[in-house]
């Protein structure tokens, strides 16, 4: 009763302006429900030593994944100065569902290359999409596979494909959604094809690891139909916007069909006096390392214009929460759920006993340059691609992109993530400790 009176008093004290910026889930809690139609999952086997996620009951969340809105009054007189112009309203990630303004008509199918085991799933999927009257886009090099080119039974379907070439054809405004057949690398490749807005991605686990590919291909027809109809759960995987500025050293930049050197978009090329700028969208991580040199890399890291540290070691990884389970995890970083807005900085074999990985807010801007004392150059890669050399005077600016990758979930963002931790990375797997027998307990007490 006292708690209810306190809530009523707090609501009365809020001014109309303040109430407009108050989260509706401030005083919510998580409750159990037997009839909630969307959220929840059945009890399943988990490889983790922890209890399985969920049970036969269904779970209804009444609190945002971002947590409750903080009370902004402190003591009897202090409060946070309100500035409505700087307040950003963010939808609860747990409630994000895919919907269509118009029925989807075109789909891009990306298949892992040089994998014969994927030919049959690829043919079955494309045939099904054609039967659903979808326009199917594939890469031209996929159709050049001898196994597909020589298959006469697949010829009628193959003639209906729309093809494109990476780094030459812009299909960003022609694709309604993407289907990936392969592993995590296939999804990373799909992300690299879209340097702006990314269509929703449905990823089937047909590769090696599959941490980012939650769908099984066994029931692909019903799952694809559900996505086409809409109302599927999605997780917005943040990407990094990376701008590389290099000093021109007597080399002209080649531009082919709107694309610059290393496949960067022409819109990302900014030819200043003596400068060349390229821009990339990165899903996992930006890696700056020493390359083939035997010397330690020596790079300065700036945050919002301030020098925060100098990295001396094999290099440094700047990753998204999605990338925290990739190279960063191998380098000793913590794993971050993709709904946590953050950027992670992880050193690679630092020559220091106190250099721990750190997590910084998603809205900061990082800038990485060779230190003036550096004995050699450095090398940078973006999701393992577009590797290039960084010299003195060059800079790499990194911040969170406004174009996330919308990844379609099997269940929901939280359940899918912990399922991947258990099934792919075998997180916290150990033999369970046996309990004491009653006689042994009595002897110890005696």
Swiss-Prot record:
Report which reactions are catalysed by this protein: NAD(+) + ATP = ADP + NADP(+) + H(+)
Ranges that cross the membrane: none
Q: What Pfam families is this protein classified in?
A: NAD_kinase, NAD_kinase_C
Activity-pH dependence? Optimum pH is 7.5.
Answer yes or no on keyword rRNA-binding: no
Residues bearing Phosphoserine are 46, 48, 50, 55, 64
The Gene Ontology terms for molecular function here are:
ATP binding; metal ion binding; NAD+ kinase activity
Enzyme Commission code(s) on record: 2.7.1.23
The record's listing under InterPro entries reads: ATP-NAD_kinase_N (IPR017438), ATP-NAD_kinase_PpnK-typ_C (IPR017437), NAD/diacylglycerol_kinase_sf (IPR016064), NADK (IPR002504)
Q: In which tissues is it expressed?
A: Widely expressed but not detected in skeletal muscle.
Task: Please indicate if the UniProt record lists Secreted as a keyword.
Answer: no
Looking at the record's lineage, which domain of life comes first?
Answer: Eukaryota
What cofactor is needed?
a divalent metal cation
User: What keywords were assigned to this record?
Assistant: ATP-binding, Kinase, Metal-binding, NAD, NADP, Nucleotide-binding, Phosphoprotein, Transferase
- What GO biological process terms are annotated to this protein in UniProt? ATP metabolic process; NAD metabolic process; NADP biosynthetic process; phosphorylation; positive regulation of insulin secretion involved in cellular response to glucose stimulus
Gene Ontology CC entries for this record:
cytosol
Q: What is the relationship between temperature and activity?
A: Optimum temperature is 55 degrees Celsius.
Q: What is the uppermost EC class here?
A: transferase
* Family of this protein: Belongs to the NAD kinase family.
Q: Which HAMAP family match?
A: NAD_kinase
The family database entries (PANTHER family) matched by this protein are listed as: NAD KINASE (PTHR20275:SF0)
Q: What is this protein called?
A: NAD kinase
Per the UniProt record, the source organism is: Homo sapiens (Human)
Q: What is the lineage of its organism?
A: Eukaryota, Metazoa, Chordata, Craniata, Vertebrata
Gene responsible for this protein: NADK
